[in-house]
């Protein structure tokens, strides 16, 4: 389907706006995927907060110009789509990694975070990053553990005294002499 100039400009503006807010981007080859598989992938992407779009490579290059994803321009060859993570850097990587296991024809080409390109082999490291909520809960656990240990240490002398008094009381109650 050919786009007229106004439609092309609108696509470039939309992708540029999303790319400027995005944290990470993944480029993947969709050759061999069925329409149903792509529809399912798009549906899951919307649920995950990932912007997934098939755009002509020349338009994507224009949209990525002067963004941190300009480093992906060399990989925009052939039938590819872009997936932009808007909430967490690992969202798009995790989504596509899971789908690459299910749909073997989905080929992840590269990932970009912070202006650096990572190849498909390194995507597992980014996909395994915790979400923001998981990271906060782990941090809270790590911060809470020393405080709990300190409180237990402070309470131990009193508890030991109470146990000793209870043992003395039981011993005296057992021996009336």
Curated annotation (Swiss-Prot):
Molecular function as annotated in GO: large ribosomal subunit rRNA binding; structural constituent of ribosome
InterPro entries on file: Ribosomal_uL10, Ribosomal_uL10-like_sf, Ribosomal_uL10_bac, Ribosomal_uL10_bac_type, Ribosomal_uL10_CS_bac
GO biological process: translation
GO CC aspect terms: large ribosomal subunit
Pfam families xref list: Ribosomal_L10
Family annotation (CDD domains): Ribosomal_L10
RNA-binding in keyword set: yes
Keyword RNA-binding assigned: yes
PROSITE patterns assigned: RIBOSOMAL_L10
Key words of the record: Ribonucleoprotein, Ribosomal protein, RNA-binding, rRNA-binding
Record note on quaternary structure: Part of the ribosomal stalk of the 50S ribosomal subunit. The N-terminus interacts with L11 and the large rRNA to form the base of the stalk. The C-terminus forms an elongated spine to which L12 dimers bind in a sequential fashion forming a multimeric L10(L12)X complex.
Job description of the protein: Forms part of the ribosomal stalk, playing a central role in the interaction of the ribosome with GTP-bound translation factors.
Protein family (similarity comment): Belongs to the universal ribosomal protein uL10 family.
Protein name: Large ribosomal subunit protein uL10
Species this chain originates from: Legionella pneumophila subsp. pneumophila (strain Philadelphia 1 / ATCC 33152 / DSM 7513)
Gene behind this protein: rplJ
């Amino acid at each position: 389907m050919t786009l007229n100039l106004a439609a092309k400009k609108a696509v470039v503006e939309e992708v540029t706006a999303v790319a400027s807010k995005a944290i990470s981007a993944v480029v993947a080859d969709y050759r061999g995927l069925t329409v149903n598989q792509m529809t399912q992938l798009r549906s899951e992407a919307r649920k995950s907060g990932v912007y997934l779009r098939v755009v002509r490579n020349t338009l994507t290059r224009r949209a990525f110009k002067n963004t941190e994803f300009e480093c992906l321009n060399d990989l925009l060859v052939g039938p590819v789509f872009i997936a932009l993570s808007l909430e967490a850097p690992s969202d798009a990587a995790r989504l596509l990694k899971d789908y690459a296991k299910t749909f073997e024809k989905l080929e992840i080409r590269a990932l970009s975070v912070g202006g650096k390109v990572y190849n498909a082999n390194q995507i597992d490291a980014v996909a395994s990053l915790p979400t923001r909520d998981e990271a906060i809960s782990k941090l809270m656990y790590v911060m809470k553990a020393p405080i709990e240990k300190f409180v237990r240490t402070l309470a131990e002398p009193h508890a030991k005294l109470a146990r000793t008094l209870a043992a003395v009381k039981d011993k005296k109650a057992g021996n009336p002499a």
